[in-house]
């Protein structure tokens, strides 16, 4: 654990303000506004992922039209290409990509460990071989922060020691948690622009709730502008995922934003909001819109090698490549206000499921249009969640949400969601 003590630790400047507007009277859900240097962000929020400063299937003008106020870039990829020198020369990632709203960047640690087989983690940092030329490289907490300072993102993440929650090595999980705390201290020391970039800490500890509590206490003591819960969405059981989120939000301060990293499936989000989380990100809504002509047989939400022409709708997902949609002349989602679904007399394209079926498998425009719909759907869903919290109707929202997906058949409601929501006062199985 770090040797920095509370008495010697200086207060960290903040480039954000966090206004709380409403809290659900039953669950831990909250409606807030996060004021950042490039605009105000309504919470809870889903953040689309523009990995390499480009969102798959959308221009930034189209992303603006969805109402998005905060999206992600990837520090690891931008550090490799275009590289730090180019980022410094152009004046940061906002100017590089022509995006005048907020950016959040991860630290690069997750990519080091998850994408590179030859990565080695030591106290110094993460050693790996460049995927471009095979040369040895080292990512330290200091270098990660330096890269993010050059990127100029509104929210930057500490470099943490990432290990899969499914790892059986408890000693390694504890080591990663302790090291993440020490690395946070190094990130804080290196951070040059706290008056315009907000450094978030990342809670680690695997599925061990005592380690999570310990990490929360250590991270909270360092008083970063916001807090992330990391190391989840890595194959753990949903019941365990919910326990970790619930445990952490019980400890984390009410007056700071809470970000659960890597979460993007609608069912996961609505439950995590009830457990007290505010911010979410995932590549799934854009990835699932893209169809490659490969054999099917795997789950597009978990197999990164398969991408499908799927539309996210209130009843789950529509696999528009299926022949059953070839003569379905309804919009992708009834009542959706995205430009694809909106009727022509309301300024939309008025596209049908039949047309999307026709172009999804062969035309790149199909992936483009589905991505517009999926991102719009996710952001619109977050708006409905927020309004339900403000109206103190979030419990009713949850019941309708799961009823819509499972066509009113409560026997099909996922047990993990039923159990997690019962723990915060919502019984999905009770008679309405």
Mark where each language-model region is.
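Non-catalytic, usually N-terminal nucleic-acid engagement modules in DNA/RNA processing proteins
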Residues: 1-193, 318, 323
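C-terminal extensions of enzymes
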Residues: 2-35, 41-50, 56-57, 160-167, ...
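Glycine-rich phosphate/ribose-binding loops and adjacent secondary-structure elements
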Residues: 2-8, 178-181, 190, 194-335
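Conserved, mostly hydrophobic/aromatic
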Residues: 39, 71, 106, 148, ...
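Alpha-helical packing segments of well-folded alpha/beta enzyme cores
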Residues: 144, 176, 180-183, 187, ...
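Structural signal for hydrophobic packing residues in well-ordered secondary-structure cores
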Residues: 152, 184, 188-191, 223, ...
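Glycine- and acidic
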Residues: 165-170, 174, 226-233, 365-367
